[in-house]
């Protein structure tokens, strides 16, 4: 199956799911919304046919409902086929793509949230648009039989409990994801339709619940006056079916593509040292599912030349025009005329290792007019290119120039482009270890001179340098003019918004009050360098307090105290004596603090009448004059 270009192996199909998820993650919101509305419009064709079959021949429904279920299964398969071929977005299929993508770490949870929410809302909008405009207003769904049939359909669906609808939704999307997965394995269009038809017929015939498939039928019935309110439809059908489809899609995605076809296969290949392949996406364009193929590593460079096969069909005249365009023939060829050049057999010209030598005469010597490197308008090659290049080597020269452009970050490795970045290599092959990359090891030794000497920290350094190398490659790609997909996709914007909101909420939290620092805390006599006043925590605390309104008010107002007219030192001494402070204590207070530092509010307190006794053999040594 590997050699057949029309089919893919399960491992290649699982990688195609990952590549498609990365492709859908870079869709802008307007494109994603339009794709989702289109998906609802296209898939509603199955719902319209469901109502038509059940309404216009009620006798068959009553006598042989199995035939009706088989027919409606084919109808929904047609709707899914339209969605896949047009590259539209369906909520149920996006569950498959982004679940595997998140498990593979190819996309983020923010990409998943945007895709699921927008596609879900877009499918609702598209289904409602078709049901109202082309169903109700056109009068098609207002026919008597359609009114009766549509009412019966939705009233039967909402008759189940929440849990019953939830369980039916789980089984339904398991089959839908299986249908999407099977069609990825085939390239012919008719085979795609056949493969996706079987699972769709299964879940329709059994009676499972598809949230998008039931939308148009439910809207038609409610517009026809069914005994179902909008709230009842949302609670009994829309919500349980959506949740069930999510669970069923997650289960299929985690078990089949991710675990069985990616983890198990790659783990076994590494254990047995099986031949290694490079996986490349040959359909990287938007609005279409990816197609991942495997090629051997030594074939990656030669693969780029396949796109230049049209150049190999050039005639000898076209080949000769490379050398004589806008110039005189005699200026380029000596010893041989241009006719002798044209007489060289084509088999000789198209050989890989051929030179312009033959048995017809002396070798042709190329003599350029000047050292100009003006490019030929035909092939874009310099005129001073040596003549011994064959057409195939010229093709390789041009294609390899394009091939040297690395596969962009955030995109699954593209066939025909250069080597992907480190992050994309790990997405392509989970067993790839950047630490084993020879080029990476050389750069690691350059960045860290102690890398080889300190074996104990070797692994930690490598893990750190892996991220450094990935960032370096991405910056180098952007510097060369590459488009940064990772910074411009909607999921990244959503992540930045949520992070910004979280930071604002955390910054609004009130800082718990702390006691003022003492002189000993600020300037410890035994270790001044370890003072908390000079630590980062103290600096950040002072900065935080200074940026708040309360902190600014405290900083400005702490130097001011309410007071009346200035008092003389005699008045202060009298108040000190009135509260019981003796003369020697008053003198000591004057020597230690000074009169200007006395606070009269402390002296006014009548509760502080504690008598200060005079220390013995201490104040006799003071010679300060009495006040």
UniProtKB/Swiss-Prot annotation:
Localization: Membrane
UniProt keyword annotations, A-Z: Membrane, Phosphoprotein, Transmembrane, Transmembrane helix, Transport
Keyword set includes Transcription regulation: no
Residue ranges with Polar residues bias: 517-533
GO molecular function: high-affinity secondary active nitrite transmembrane transporter activity; molecular sensor activity
PROSITE patterns per record: FORMATE_NITRITE_TP_1 (PS01005), FORMATE_NITRITE_TP_2 (PS01006)
Extracellular side: 1-32, 88-113, 187-192, 240-245
Entry's Gene Ontology cellular component terms: fungal-type vacuole; plasma membrane
Pfam families cross-referenced by the UniProt entry: Form_Nir_trans (PF01226)
Cytoplasmic side: 54-66, 135-165, 214-218, 267-627
Region called Disordered, residue ranges: 512-537, 605-627
Keyword Transmembrane: yes
Biased composition (Basic and acidic residues): 605-614
Ranges annotated as spanning the membrane: 33-53, 67-87, 114-134, 166-186, 193-213, 219-239, 246-266
Residues bearing the modification Phosphoserine: 546
Main location: membrane
GO biological process, one term: chloride transport
Membrane topology, record value: Multi-pass membrane protein
Homology family: Belongs to the FNT transporter (TC 1.A.16) family.
Stated name of the protein: Uncharacterized transporter YHL008C
